[in-house]
Curated annotation (Swiss-Prot):
Family to which the UniProt record says this protein belongs: Belongs to the ThiI family.
Protein task: Catalyzes the ATP-dependent transfer of a sulfur to tRNA to produce 4-thiouridine in position 8 of tRNAs, which functions as a near-UV photosensor. Also catalyzes the transfer of sulfur to the sulfur carrier protein ThiS, forming ThiS-thiocarboxylate. This is a step in the synthesis of thiazole, in the thiamine biosynthesis pathway. The sulfur is donated as persulfide by IscS.
Listed name of the protein: Probable tRNA sulfurtransferase
Pathway the protein takes part in: Cofactor biosynthesis; thiamine diphosphate biosynthesis
Localization (cell): Cytoplasm
SUPFAM superfamilies: Adenine nucleotide alpha hydrolases-like, THUMP domain-like
Highest taxon listed in the record's lineage: Archaea
Record bears the keyword Glycosyltransferase: no
Gene this protein is translated from: thiI
Signal peptide positions (record): none
Main location: cytoplasm
Keyword Methyltransferase: no
Coiled coil: none
Keywords in alphabetical order: ATP-binding, Cytoplasm, Nucleotide-binding, RNA-binding, Thiamine biosynthesis, Transferase, tRNA-binding
Length: 371
């Protein structure tokens, strides 16, 4: 089986050197996802050849950096008569009783135009069909002539677009396991980041089990990259926070998470922190509290969901398969029912100094898992 893979449009806009690096990363991610086959670059597309006709090429729809892909039949000929005869052989049964259109595309120098190909192939297929409609066909027939090769297909399967996972470096994700953090992780992967997962386990075995189920769903989108997970025992942090006024505990917990993520960035050479926060969704995510929460953190903090409402986030969670696990997870971060919407920075910093949390020790005592 031969497949034409079309990289995301923005990859083509990169400089030649960057484009080459992005495409090679994409090729590696495709190979890791499919598990084998011959793969190479060719004039702006990627060609994948697999021996097994039952290969799971549908998995390409979950490889970031792919705009679309098509299983194709290829012939080594750019002779117009050969092209028309092959089109008739392949597509006569497919257009039978249906309204169709032929779309042709050429790269290279030929003695005919793309319109010539469309007309001749259309004439050959017309007797088998219900008619031609170039605007609203039931079936589209595609013919691509690339120099001396010609490719025939009738399916264009959408990819997720974005950038290949790995081109943007690593980010530490504060992963609670609720609806938001898996979606934020997915969105950063779509921009080429490899996520390093930091989870504060505040709910015991059930929490851990559901988080791992969510991450197994996200693993499908990773382009074969391993997901490294640091699971912190959250009860120890809770004990520390019991010394803080109840209304300030949510923001203090977030501060502990951010500072631990900062330490993990240092250890893993990650260059950013990612969270699933959305502006004003809850009291700890007001602009004032986000300012307090991230104060003094030296790494950039990415919040891909900052402008999304809950309905939009849920739609993505359903699409990527994490929602069914997320809804089973209680909101463990809601440790105070009377949280302030605007914490006092100086008070928070004094509490932080008094608690004297050992972030290095938190990571040393964490459980590390690779998926």
């Amino acid at each position: 089986m031969l497949v034409i893979i079309r990289p995301s449009g923005e990859i083509a806009l990169k400089s030649p050197r960057s484009r080459r690096n992005f495409e090679y990363t994409l090729i590696n991610n495709i190979r890791n996802t499919i598990g084998g086959g011959k793969i190479w670059r060719s004039q702006g597309v990627i060609l994948l050849e697999v021996n097994d006709n039952n290969a799971n090429i549908e998995a390409l729809s979950e490889v970031f950096g792919i705009s679309s892909f098509s299983p194709v039949i290829a012939i080594k000929s750019n002779n117009l008569e050969d092209i028309v005869n092959k089109a008739k052989e392949i597509f006569a049964e497919i257009v039978k009783g249906k309204i169709f259109a032929v779309r042709a595309k050429r790269i290279g120098s030929h003695s005919f135009t793309s319109l010539d190909v469309e007309r001749r192939a259309g004439e050959a297929l017309y007797p088998y069909s219900k008619g031609v409609d170039l605007e609203n066909p039931e079936v589209e027939i595609f013919i691509e002539i690339r120099n001396e090769m010609t490719y025939f297909y009738h399916k264009v399967i959408k990819g997720p677009k974005g950038l290949p996972v790995g081109v943007a470096g690593k980010t530490v994700v504060l992963f609670s396991g609720g609806i938001d953090s898996p979606v934020a992780t997915w969105m950063m992967m779509k921009r080429g980041s490899v996520p390093i997962i930091l989870n504060f386990n505040l709910g015991g075995d059930l929490h851990k089990e559901l988080v791992l189920k969510e991450l197994n769903m996200l693993k499908r989108w990773s382009g074969g990259h391993k997901l490294k997970i640091f699971i912190v025992k959250g009860t120890d942090v809770f004990i520390k926070l019991s010394q803080v006024e109840r209304r300030s505990r949510v923001v203090m917990l977030k501060r502990v998470m951010y500072k631990t993520a900062e330490k993990l960035c240092e250890k893993t050479n990650a260059k950013s922190i990612t969270t699933g926060e959305s502006l004003s969704q809850v009291s700890s995510q007001t602009m004032a509290n986000l300012y307090v929460t991230e104060y003094g953190i030296k790494y950039p903090i990415f919040r891909p969901l900052i402008g999304f409402d809950k309905e939009e986030i849920v739609d993505i969670a359903r699409k990527i398969g994490t929602y069914k696990h997320s809804i089973k997870l209680p909101e463990y971060c809601a440790i105070s029912t009377k949280a302030r919407t605007s914490e006092d920075l100086n008070e928070i910093l004094k509490n932080e100094e008094r608690l004297n949390v050992d972030y290095e020790k938190i990571l040393e005592n964490s459980e590390v898992i690779e998926l």
